Regions:
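Short conserved segment of the HATPase_c
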Residues: 274-286
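Conserved micro-motifs of the catalytic ATP-binding
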Residues: 174-179, 219-222
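PAS-family sensory/regulatory modules and their coupling/dimerization elements
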Residues: 46-102
Length: 339
């Protein structure tokens, strides 16, 4: 293989896009990554007809190097690209293209999370701060004092729940790619979660029923603690948002789907219908359909986000449906090893 072909092969194996520009501003070479973004017909085309970025074009015209960001809409989607142009003494220019789309999205998610956490904690802190000022008045009625202290305790508990759920979510993300080396019986884990919530459901006049096959279902590779947490969150939600004196049904069945076996587990409750536009967003952090009601029942807005991340780790799918009668179903599909 000639040196030139070896060099081209090397450039084509880079994770960044590379474009070489002539002194006449024409594109002499583009590696495979650059072609993926800008198409395979860019050779011999002026660079300013391919990348319409004024900062880059000014730098090329003035024979100077530059680093700039570029939002590009291509046939494969919208991309945030970092453009690093280097002018060489032989009047050639080398443009390095790095895709920052995922990194920028991550940064935006991080910023949104910080903003949401700040907002969620500011509200109870403001309430507590206001009552502290009121309680500093020595002439306040004892009954009022007791009432205010009760509210302060509840707001403090709310902050504790938010922080606890955030720590839980962080732990799940840290262990996202850790090996799942347990073989567990799914029904046993669901029963454990159910048993922990039976008393609370009973106190609210509700019941939790579970149905499963009368034969031994296959075990799945999983983290048993996380699976219990998934069903604890789903059953807890069903208790919170179902009608008074209603039943929460849990159904486990072995199904075939797309030529593979799955253990399908559904948590079903009847309450206020959830509009279709809300369903895809229910697993977002701090997303609530009814913010006031969620806070009143002790929701943090993080329970379903925790469920989502645990299921991602387990390569399991979550489907959520809600009909006009208020029957809401959370169905999870756990893949079963067919071997």
């Amino acid at each position: 293989m000639s040196y030139g072909k070896q060099f081209n092969t090397l450039l084509n194996h880079l994770s960044e896009g590379v474009i070489i520009v002539s002194e006449d501003f024409d594109i002499l070479f583009a590696n495979e990554i650059a072609i993926k973004y800008f198409g395979n017909k860019i050779i011999d085309i002026p660079i300013y007809n391919v990348i319409r970025n004024s900062e880059l074009i000014d730098a090329i015209n003035e024979n100077r190097s530059i680093d700039t960001m570029f939002l590009y809409n291509s046939s494969i989607g919208k991309h945030i690209l970092e453009l690093s142009y280097h002018h060489k003494k032989n009047n050639l220019g080398i443009l390095i293209i790095r895709d920052k789309t995922i990194e920028e999205k991550f940064q935006n998610v991080r910023k949104d999370l910080i903003a949401n956490v700040s907002h969620e904690l500011r509200s109870p802190l403001t309430t507590i701060s206001g009552f502290i000022e009121t309680l500093q008045n020595e002439e306040i009625d004892p009954n009022q004092r007791a009432k205010f202290l009760g509210i302060m305790k509840e707001e403090s508990n709310r902050m504790d729940r938010i922080i606890s759920d955030l720590l839980s979510l962080s732990k799940i993300e840290i262990n996202m790619y850790a090996e799942l080396d347990e073989k567990i019986n799914l029904i046993d884990q669901i029963k454990t979660a159910k048993d922990a919530l039976d008393l609370r459901a009973d106190e609210l006049g509700k019941s939790i029923n579970i149905r499963y096959p009368d034969y031994d279902t296959p075990n799945i590779s999983a983290d048993s603690d996380q699976i219990i947490e998934v069903f604890h969150n789903l059953i807890d939600n069903a208790i919170k948002y179902s009608h008074e004196n209603s039943a929460i049904d849990i159904l486990v069945e072995l199904i075939e789907r797309q030529d593979r076996s799955y253990l399908k587990s559904s948590v079903i409750n009847v309450g206020t219908p959830i509009s279709e536009e809300h369903l895809p967003r229910l697993t977002e952090r701090f997303y609530r359909v009814d913010k006031a009601r969620s806070r009143n029942v002790g929701g943090t807005g993080l329970g379903l986000a925790i469920v989502k991340h645990i299921l991602l780790r387990h390569n399991a799918e979550l489907e959520i449906t809600s009909d006009i009668d208020g029957k809401t179903t959370f169905s999870i599909f756990f893949p079963v090893d067919n071997n």
